[in-house]
């Protein structure tokens, strides 16, 4: 059983590694900083024409990205470049050196961190609901935005893994102070890798002191956080002359001829974050690429968090629910809430492992209803990943699947991706204690799938015109599915009592 469980996660990791997604401004902004650091500078003047995700300061270009991912990758890239391996692989594969480098660095900076995250989710899921850790991890890895972004050299995979690892360290710390300090260190480096992870680091800190001995544990955790953000402070000091000058400052809005015609991309509010808007929050959840629209399984996760609270894991459920709310509120106040070319609201990715904590209890309580929303989530995520997630800002990826073009090279290069995902699902099914479906199970799955289809159709049409009607439909559908399961549960207890 343990071997099949690990193989299920390994199959997903191989699925991530089987695709190379090419360039894009975000990936190339990270890559430009990696290359600059190998030459001992943070200035990306030599590469500024490759990307628009830049800042301009004292007549020089800088990547507007947090430097944590580049810190991890600078050593491997230096070896690849100086050894001539990049040139050799480029000649062998026929791809450009940049494409080869993005794929290899993506393995280190995105694929491996996501694999570690899934292992952590498996372990925590099994603690919360024995036997349901593997399906928790596989659902998170195949049916949420973690899937496409595990194949891209963005900072989300690394920072999200670090943020959740900080929680796991504190969660298992018991009476020892060292795990609290290590949790703080990991949480601090998550901030160094993606600034909004301060929300996760702060929330995990509150969770740490809620476990008792608040002063000692809080101090150990805080000391770790300081050490974790120290590389960021040193980088800012050396690059910009001040430890408090973040790369978000002086971000370029429009490049123009000079490359910095208009500055101030993040000047509104605090680095682009101002007063949250309810309409933006609705868009983040229910628009054409809203979180619920493209990955409806998160609704099952949210319900699972409520069930987790009721089962006695109250601190953990409160942490997860609070983080989800915090990220939606923060993102609803951000100037570019969807973050450009993306298959969904990518700035919400750091909260997804915490939503996934609810998958274990959801599968335990309502297995087939959860499967009913997990399947379309996985199909959509597989589709956008196979057709390049950066191009999935609309649902035109469906056309690229149906016409067989995918990313322009046809279906054959994408077959390993699909095979590995299917293999992972099959192995996961073998180790998960969910029996064969009965008639009522099939009805439950169809009810949840039908509810999703209604929301997927109505949501994008009502989100900007009649949000109250959308909310009423969503609540009614949720109540209907819930009442069905409550009725089944009571009916089962009545039959057991009469027997």
Q: What are the language-model segments listed below?
A:
Residues 1-499:
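Membrane-proximal envelope and lipid/glycan-remodeling enzymes
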